[in-house]
Amino acid sequence: MSDYVYDLMKKHHSVRQFKDKALSDETVQKLVEAGQSASTSSYLQTYSIIGVDDPEIKKQLKEVSGQPYVVDNGYLFVFVLDYYRHNLINENVDFDMQTSFESAEGLLVGAIDVALVSENVALAAEDMGYGIVYLGSLRNDVARVKEILDLPEYAFPLFGMAVGEPADDENGAPKPRLPFEHVFHKNVYNSNAKEQREAIQKYDEEISEYYKERTNGKRQETWSQQVAGFLSGKTRLDMLEELNKSGLMKK
């Protein structure tokens, strides 16, 4: 791997302020084709990408997300876990395919495919000089997003991605990640609780200092506090129901 690719990856951060400049159709096609080049489980290609440039549709999706950059961006992508085309194939063969794509394994395969595609899109966009931000907030109301985008059965919106030229006053920066030694386990998983707690405590101190410097002391939250606050929120507990309504996760 060249230093250029490594450095590009290491510089990644979410961009939430964009210039009012739309991506060209040529750029959109290049990004999607870069996404399609990602690895896909068993060549199933269990994904679709909805490109949104209609201001009214963006506005409706913003009402779901609550984020202004759903509208204010160069282009909006919505990444969809998609077994609809596979179901069409199923209608014309003598095999039972539905059991597979309605299963938990089918959900995992689809979600992984979508994630790999989206990261290719993100990396290609950043290589072109654009900024990106993922939009998991579109899952705030999955039923509404499916309605807005006219998604058929077996098609499920996982997340969006806003892409565009970063605004001149955009001042985002990469957040410190967990240390290498804390996420890389050699041969077997290191479940030593004492070592894990010590590593978390050290990382908490680093993150608290990071926020303190970025906000002139207004924020000193630790990573543990941030994680606890998010995971105790009990949000989107209807997700299994919504997956089932889309024909997924039934087995």
UniProtKB/Swiss-Prot annotation:
A single MF term (Gene Ontology): oxidoreductase activity
Keyword NADP belongs to the record: yes
The keyword Oxidoreductase is annotated on this UniProt entry: yes
Pfam families: Nitroreductase (PF00881)
Cofactor: FMN
Purpose of the protein: Reduces FMN, organic nitro compounds and disulfide DTNB. Involved in maintenance of the cellular redox state and the disulfide stress response.
Family the entry assigns: Belongs to the flavin oxidoreductase frp family.
Protein's UniProt name: NADPH-dependent oxidoreductase
